[in-house]
């Protein structure tokens, strides 16, 4: 029996909560395979990044390993390089010495997050303080 493959791209709130929902519904079915792909192996609770930056919380207080959160959804730590919509294939690389990994899908969820828009204002990207990652909070 051919399984229906669902791939979720992105390990932020959108991707992880989609995976959690599917973990309790579709992923229970024998004919469905759900996979979450993220470059990070943890969910970062970004609303508390300012607490890490101020020293009130440790970084470990606001991260949760994705693998521990999911029972039936497979997790793949990889970087998405491109998506072939015609072939229904996601091209990724994984590992320190990037190894190609191609994942076929029947249904694709895009939850890749966002990038800060500085609206073309000169010098802002280099001097602005952003809080989107643990690295930002450590600075």
Tell me the role of every PLM-derived stretch.
Residues 1-82:
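Beta1-alpha1 glycine-rich phosphate/pyrophosphate-binding loop at the start
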Residues 1-3, 74-139:
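FAD-binding core/adjacent interface of flavoenzyme oxidoreductases
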């Amino acid at each position: 029996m051919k399984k229906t493959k669902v791939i979720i791209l992105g390990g932020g709130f959108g991707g992880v909560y989609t995976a959690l929902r599917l973990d309790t519904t579709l992923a229970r079915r024998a004919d469905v395979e759900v996979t979450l792909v993220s470059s990070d192996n943890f969910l970062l609770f970004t609303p508390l990044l300012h607490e890490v930056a101020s020293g009130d919380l440790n970084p470990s207080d606001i991260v949760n390993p994705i693998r521990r959160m999911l029972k039936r959804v497979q997790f793949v730590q990889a970087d998405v390089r491109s998506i072939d919509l015609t072939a229904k294939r996601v091209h990724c690389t994984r590992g320190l010495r990037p190894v190609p990994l191609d994942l076929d899908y029947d249904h694709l969820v895009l939850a890749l997050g966002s990038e800060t828009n500085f609206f073309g204002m000169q010098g802002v990207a280099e001097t602005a303080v952003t809080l989107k990652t643990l690295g930002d909070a450590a600075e």
